[in-house]
């Protein structure tokens, strides 16, 4: 283990900094998951006596469910350290399970290690609000569901979007989910391809329905007030948004997902 702790050649993947960053934000109800077994000794050296769980090696989908479902039921937030995915989880079953069953808030890279953060919250399986919003000619948003209506600064806003491919989708698109203040200024956002990049739009088949979950991290200094949540789509590698039509009428380049109330922290 000497090399892991003291040889600069091993410092590219800075587990000390990862552990420090997690410790700075950890709160009761958080846990850390390691997706590669050889992460255990070096990470727990810097992060001892905490809730840390090694993921099963080469899991199948049932094994991923057996491992993750109890953790998602016990903890509110999960930190995932992804390293050597091609060897430890080549089919990405851990990441796929979490895309279906949690709300990812973002990634951060430390050398070759990727730290991802997920919020565990109720999982709507059908829209709470139905929509008939068409993005371009090939994609329809059938509706959305929010978990909760009032949030405090620092909370995660869980959003589920329900997409449908009307026909073959020729290109890859990203989704942006944005929280706007009363002046229309951006307050928080999450941008990624559907399913956290696992369900690329150019793989959708006509009639396919995609349940797509997003965790929007609210800034710690977000002022209290009412905010509007919106969703849009844009081409990967570009910035121009797809046009939106609702009830056969042009509706700009985004769709409103309703309002969210931010209240002072207790």
Across the structure, where does each feature detected by a protein language model lie?
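C-terminal luminal/periplasmic domains and tails of membrane-associated envelope-modifying transferases
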Residues: 12, 16-41, 45-266
């Amino acid at each position: 283990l000497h090399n892991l702790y003291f040889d600069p050649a091993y410092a590219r993947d800075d587990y000390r900094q990862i552990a420090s960053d997690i410790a700075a934000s950890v709160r009761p109800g958080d846990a850390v998951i390691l997706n590669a077994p050889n992460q255990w000794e070096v990470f727990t050296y810097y992060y001892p006596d905490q809730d840390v769980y090694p993921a099963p090696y080469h899991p199948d989908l049932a094994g991923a469910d057996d491992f993750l479902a109890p953790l998602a039921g016990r903890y509110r937030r999960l930190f995932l350290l992804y390293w050597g995915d091609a060897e430890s989880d080549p089919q990405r079953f851990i990441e796929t399970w979490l895309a279906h069953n949690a709300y990812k808030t973002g990634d951060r890279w430390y050398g070759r290690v990727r730290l991802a953060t997920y919020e565990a919250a109720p999982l709507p399986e059908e829209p709470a609000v139905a929509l008939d919003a068409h993005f371009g000619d090939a994609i329809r948003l059938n509706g959305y569901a929010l978990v909760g209506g009032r949030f405090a600064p620092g909370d995660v806003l869980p959003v589920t979007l329900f997409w449908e491919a009307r026909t073959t989708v020729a290109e890859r698109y990203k989704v942006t989910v944005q929280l706007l203040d009363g002046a229309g200024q951006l307050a928080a956002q999450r941008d990624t391809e559907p399913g956290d990049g696992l369900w690329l739009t150019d793989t959708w088949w006509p009639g396919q329905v995609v349940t797509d979950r997003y965790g929007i991290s609210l800034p710690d200094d977000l002022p209290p007030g009412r905010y509007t949540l919106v969703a849009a789509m844009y081409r990967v590698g570009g910035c121009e948004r797809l046009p939106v039509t609702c009830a056969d009428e042009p509706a700009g380049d985004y769709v409103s997902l309703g309002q969210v109330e931010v209240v002072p922290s207790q």
